[in-house]
Structure formats: C-alpha cells, structure tokens
Amino acid sequence: QSGTYNVNDKDYLTMEAITGPTIEYATMDDVITELGQNYSDGVNRAILHGTPYAKTFNGYNSQWPGWLPFGGGSFGSAYTYRAAYWDDIDTETSYMSRIQAVLQKGTAQIDLAVLIDKESTFDFESGNRFQNLLDSGYSYNLISEAILESDNAYVEDGKLAPEGPAFKALILDRINTFDVENMEKVIEYAKSGLPVIVYDSTFSKVYGSNVEDDAVLAEKFAELLEMDNVIQTNSVEDVKQALADVNVVKEYSFKIEL
C-alpha cells in the first residue's frame, strides 16, 4: 500500500496498531518494535487500538477493570485508562508522535518500483520478495498496474514519479498478464531514461479482455527488450547485478565501525 500512497502524494497511510492475536502480553518494547516495522514499510499514522467509551450502557462489568471485549482469543486488550501501564503511556505515545511528525512532513525517496502481476494482487505478497536487495541497502515499493494510470506516474530525468518517491528503476516481477496500453507506458518510461529490469516475466496474455491482444502484447514486449536500458533475467540473484549494469545505486547507505 505504501507504493500507492507515495506515488499519489497522499497525506496519510494509516494502520490500527497492535490488534493481532497472540499479543495479549505485549510489552511497550514489543509495541515499539511492531510500530517501527510498520513505519519502515511506509505507515506514517498509527492509531492505537483503544476504547471509545468509559463504561458500558447497561452496567455490565462496570467495576474495575471493567469490560475488556478483546481479552479472549489471545488478542491484546484495548488501550484504556484502566490498564496498569496507563501512567506511563505518555512515554510511548510521545515517541510515536515525534516519529509520525517526521514521516508525515517528509517525502519518501524509494530506490525501486516493483510492478507485480494482476493475478498476484489477489495473493498475499511478502515485502521480502527481494531480500538480497534489502540486504544490500536498496528500498522498494510494490506497485500494481493501476498506479501506472496515476497522473504522477511519469518519468523525468530518468526517475518514475519524480515529485514523490522518484523511483530509479522499474522491476517487472514475474508478470504473465498485462494490458497493451500499460506496456506502451513502460516502453515510454524506458525511452525517457528509466532503467527497466524484467525478472522471470513472459507477458503472454491480456487479462480480462474480449479483444485478442495477446499477439500485440508479445510484440510490444519484444520491442521493450530491444532497448539498451532494459535487462531481462530469470534469476532473483541476478537482479542486483542488473541494477548495477544500468548504474542504479541505492539512495542511502551506512557503515558500521567496529
């Protein structure tokens, strides 16, 4: 979702925080760890799972600690003044507010856009699909074809969505189904200087169309592969080398001195 948020220049990418099962005994350290993981994924507004009322309407379990609707099933309790940690909650929430202020004020700069297949959008997609790139310091957003239709999805100075994440390259990730019109956009991106890495993709058919455009799509795909800044690979390990071959470097790096 952060790809959509970043390209379309939205104000907030919101999550309801600390709501999953098996967290009934989560400490503040656990909460901060989970929040940090989501902040790094692009979330810039986390809303703690709270209780919007002080008491029940019919007096049920009105004595302390009151009614806790999520106390069963291994779900964490709602954030409420009845909790034992409430006197210390400002330590956690003030940290959250500072982090979120920076994230909401700034503009994310992301190295790579990873475009996934239309059929893949119905599956659970892991943000660690290119772990070797993450380990090397690259950042990326997963995007779908719909994002290519955004007014902000254009290339300038060799970067996609230059007013937002300013992606330095586009990775076409295991794509079999695709629209002809969007393939033409990708070709224009490449002509405008955006490096394109084609990973394990065939572009063999048009999805959900009554028009027999499969042959046209294949023809356009062949045209894309002829371009100098387009590299095709079937190995996830070779994607990193392909990025180096088209001079795509990561935006940020760090060095640990021992």
Model-inferred region functions:
Residues Q1-L258:
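Carbohydrate-binding surfaces of carbohydrate-active enzymes
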